[in-house]
Swiss-Prot record:
GO terms for cellular component: nucleoplasm. One of its GO terms (biological process) is regulation of transcription by RNA polymerase II. Its main location: nucleus. This is Gastrula zinc finger protein XlCGF44.2. Pfam families: zf-C2H2. Belongs to the krueppel C2H2-type zinc-finger protein family. InterPro entries: C2H2-ZF_Transcription_Reg, Znf_C2H2_sf, Znf_C2H2_type. Keywords: DNA-binding, Metal-binding, Nucleus, Repeat, Transcription, Transcription regulation, Zinc, Zinc-finger. GO terms for molecular function: DNA-binding transcription repressor activity, RNA polymerase II-specific; RNA polymerase II cis-regulatory region sequence-specific DNA binding; zinc ion binding. It is found in: Nucleus.
C-alpha cells in the first residue's frame, strides 16, 4: 500500500491526509476535553465513546438477546456465546469452548497458579472474582 502522506515529526506515513491529520494530534496533545470529568483525549471519536460512561448510553445491542453494550468490541465478544460452534479446544482435557478468551480462562483451572491473595488471611485464588466472594466472608 502506498502511503504518500508523512508526519514531519516522526516520519510515520499514511494513506490519506485525513489519517495524517488525526495522527498529528498525538504530537500536539489532547485537545478534546470531557465536560463532565475533565479528562482529555486526542480524538473526538474517543471522547464521544468516553462520554457514554457518563450518560449510561449503550448503543450496541445484541440482536439475539437484546443485551446492550458501551463498545462495539464488547458486543462482538458477547455474540460468541450465541454460537453453537466451539472452535477452541483445551489441550489438557479436550473441552470445547466458543472463544479464545474463555479458553484462556478455562486453562487457569488446570494450573496451580493462584495470583489473587486475601490481604486478611493470605488464602489464594485463581480468579479475582473468587477472591472477592471470599473477602465477603470476613
Amino acid at each position: 500500500t502506498i502511503k504518500p502522506f508523512a508526519c514531519t515529526k516522526c516520519k510515520r506515513r499514511f494513506c490519506s491526509n485525513k489519517e495524517l491529520f488525526s495522527h498529528k494530534r498525538i504530537h500536539t496533545g489532547r485537545p478534546f476535553v470531557c465536560a463532565v470529568c475533565g479528562k482529555y483525549f486526542s480524538d473526538r471519536i474517543i471522547l464521544q465513546a468516553h462520554q457514554r460512561l457518563h450518560t449510561g448510553e449503550k448503543p450496541f445491542t445484541c440482536t439475539q438477546c437484546h443485551k446492550s453494550f458501551l463498545y462495539k468490541r464488547n458486543l462482538h465478544q458477547h455474540q460468541q456465546i450465541h454460537q453453537k460452534h466451539k472452535p477452541y479446544v483445551c489441550s489438557t482435557c479436550g473441552k470445547q469452548l466458543k472463544s479464545k478468551l474463555t479458553l484462556n480462562q478455562h486453562m487457569k483451572t488446570h494450573s496451580n497458579i493462584k495470583p489473587f491473595a486475601c490481604s486478611e488471611c493470605s488464602k489464594s485464588f485463581r480468579f479475582k472474582a473468587h477472591l472477592h466472594r471470599h473477602q465477603e466472608s470476613h
